[in-house]
Amino acid sequence: MKAILDTHAFLWAIAGDTRMSQHARDIFRGPSDLLLSVASIWEIIIKVQLGKLDLPQPAGPYVLGKLAENGIKTLAINLDHLLAFERLPMHHRDPFDRMLIAQSLEEDLPLVTADPAFNTYSVRVIW
């Protein structure tokens, strides 16, 4: 299964956090083609810089290492994603989540997320 990981889903999965649903854990561990948006990597870096997230090493090397370790690919932000972002209604104000929603819609891929705010958009949510 190909899917985009929400930032918290990625962080919870690599930490073995029990807040992940069994279904989301199975997708993370199974033979899936998972993507992490560069928007999520940017969000992680910002959270570390603001002191809202502690990681065992600098965010960039840590995330890149975890991506390689778990066979997760990155999803770049392209012009089509930006145009889809612009068209989104303002149900949700978090710009990182809105970019993930735009990418999900534009790429026609489900999002792995526990965030109920994603349900206000026509994205397929896995949890």
Task: Place the predicted regions along the sequence by residue.
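Short, well-structured N-terminal submotif of metal-dependent ribonuclease cores
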Residues: 1-37, 50-65, 107, 116-120
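Alpha-helical structural signal
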Residues: 24, 41-42, 96-97, 101
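Acidic active-site catalytic centers that drive phospho-/nucleotidyl reactions
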Residues: 6, 43, 97, 115
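Generic structural signal for small/hydrophobic residues in well-ordered secondary structure
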Residues: 7-8, 44, 85, 104
